[in-house]
Swiss-Prot record:
It comes from Shewanella sp. (strain W3-18-1). InterPro entries: Beta-lactam/transpept-like (IPR012338), Glutaminase (IPR015868). It holds the Pfam family Glutaminase. The gene is glsA. This is Glutaminase. Belongs to the glutaminase family.
Amino acid sequence: MPELALLEEVVEKVRPLLGQGKVANYIPALASVDAGKLGIAVTTVDGETLGAGDYLEPFSIQSISKVFSLTLALTLYEEAEIWSRVGKEPSGHSFNSLVQVELERGKPRNPFINAGALVIADLLQSRLGAPKHRMLELVRQLSQNDKVCFDKQVADSEYQHSARNAAIAYLMKSFGNFQGDVDTVLRTYFHYCALKMNCADLSRAMLYLANRGKTVDGTELISQVQTRQLNALLATSGLYDGAGEFAYRVGMPGKSGVGGGIIAVIPGELSICVWSPELDENGNSLAGTAMLEHLSQRLGRSIF
């Protein structure tokens, strides 16, 4: 377990970077977030959580939710049913690209770009009676925090600016790779993105990725093999177009969101969440990436 002094050092080390990135502004409800926030939390495979900075302040998890939705799909579907509809390759295009959907005849490159996450949401919508409620149930169980909730203002804000995601969904539907009602699935998807959690919640919730599929309370959520495969996808496709840079600098499987959060995993040891709302040109937290880089160097850890 890293000591508290190390986590505090990591936070202070990156503080000079504040002001160099930009807060996401294409979702009005996210644009008003205090740009000066910095937080980090780690949870060990023994279930102990430690944090520094603004680690208890909730934020919008955005695309980090795509890890939860894929995990939920893995518990409900045969793997062939999932991977026949979404690929496992890095994208190389922007996370909300229509061009790629057209070129690949409606099959998204991976589950962590918008097109792929919409297919996963479509799968969940078709198999669950109440997909929003089931997701809330899952993340509350994983984080051991019953107060985790959806931010309705953020969900509504995203829905009001959903033309591009709707276009992606309809394009996939034209290729036969989208089954449900587009509007209904979009609302579910935006609720997932609008989950509000803090660094401590997320580091606990993601422990199964570091712990062979087992959650904080020891329950097996997904198999050991599925966990390894999910971490492989996170290592190659979890950071938008910055996955290579992140692998080079940090050396851990990870997933970012435009709310400024990044989760990362040291398999067999730790799950980590960092938060700083200012983003780099790839849409990843600028200071958050630097925190993870410094932590990995100080711990001497990398999956490579």
